[in-house]
């Protein structure tokens, strides 16, 4: 259950990943943490040199397996799905986990490992909503048994993609090219850093999940400074037979070639604050 204020005793937070999103979170925690009842206890990055000159040496964690020594209450992952695959279950032994790369959960083995660790140690797997607009409404409709279909399209300039496998060799055939259209589970390993919005949608709608939520990835040469996310869902039919429908269109400003849009950074900060106000409970929960 949420409390009305952040904890009076400093709530200890560790950050895993020091890219654009990690840098923003660390900066805010250092500047505002004390007044919010939060204490940054470590920052880890695969390349430690990236932290030099900006993260106080005492906060730099060289070995992620030693995070227990910092006694975190919450570990925030903003690095890469590989961190969740490799270390997510171990992190849950010591702290709650805020997953910034939910595409990792498309791997069923990883999802099961996190669920088992969460139940064993009594810690929560939080998943940041990120760029997904309307996640609570999606969850409510799904819980009521009314969600019939869910489709998430993410479009941006090709320079904003970090693709793997067969998609890495994909080329735009015109000003707007559909690179992938199909189940989110199939997209996540091919575009692990560009499918997090779709993954969050799959988690918001467990009746459909990763296999029935449809993800569409579009390369659009005109979108040099933004990410565009369209969420389309169908609900139950009305008396006339016409189905309930929602379509949201979100334009998120972004630096050219950036993976993370500007509004997503702010949304993630609020997800972090929200996690700190919730009591630990086993399972995977959007935040």
UniProtKB/Swiss-Prot annotation:
It comes from the Eukaryota. Keywords: Phosphoprotein. The lineage of its organism: Eukaryota, Metazoa, Chordata, Craniata, Vertebrata. The keyword rRNA-binding does not apply. InterPro entries: Asp/hSer_DH_NAD-bd (IPR005106), Asp_DH (IPR002811), L-Asp_DH (IPR011182), NAD(P)-bd_dom_sf (IPR036291). The modification Phosphoserine is found at residues 24, 172. This is Aspartate dehydrogenase domain-containing protein. Transmembrane segments: none annotated. PANTHER family: ASPARTATE DEHYDROGENASE DOMAIN-CONTAINING PROTEIN, L-ASPARTATE DEHYDROGENASE-RELATED. GO terms for biological process: NAD biosynthetic process. GO terms for molecular function: aspartate dehydrogenase activity; NADP binding. Belongs to the L-aspartate dehydrogenase family.
């Amino acid at each position: 259950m949420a409390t009305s204020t952040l904890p009076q005793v400093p709530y200890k937070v560790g950050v895993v990943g020091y890219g654009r999103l990690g840098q923003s979170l660390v900066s805010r925690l250092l500047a505002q943490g004390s007044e919010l009842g939060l204490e940054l206890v470590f920052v880890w990055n695969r390349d430690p040199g990236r932290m030099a000159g900006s993260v106080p040496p005492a906060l730099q964690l060289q070995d992620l397996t030693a995070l227990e020594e910092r006694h975190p209450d919450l570990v925030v992952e903003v690095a890469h799905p590989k961190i969740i695959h490799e270390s997510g279950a171990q992190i849950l032994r010591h702290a709650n986990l805020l997953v910034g790369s939910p595409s990792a959960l498309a791997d069923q083995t990883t999802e099961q490992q996190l669920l088992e660790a969460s139940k064993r140690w009594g810690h929560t797997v939080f998943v940041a909503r990120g760029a997904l607009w309307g996640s609570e409404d999606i969850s409510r409709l799904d819980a009521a048994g009314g969600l019939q279909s869910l489709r998430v399209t993410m479009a941006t300039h090709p320079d904003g993609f970090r693709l793997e496998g067969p998609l890495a060799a994909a080329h735009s055939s015109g000003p707007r090219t559909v690179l992938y259209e199909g189940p989110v589970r199939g997209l996540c390993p091919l575009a692990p850093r560009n499918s997090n919005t779709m993954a969050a949608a799959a988690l918001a709608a467990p009746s459909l999940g990763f296999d029935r939520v449809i993800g569409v990835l579009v390369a659009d040469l005109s979108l040099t400074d933004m990410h565009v996310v369209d969420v389309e869902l169908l609900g139950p039919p009305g008396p006339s037979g016409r189905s309930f429908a929602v379509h949201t269109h979100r334009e998120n400003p972004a630096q050219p070639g950036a993976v993370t849009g500007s509004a997503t950074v702010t949304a993630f900060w609020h997800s972090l604050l929200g996690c700190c106000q919730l009591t630990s409970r086993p399972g995977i929960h959007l935040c």
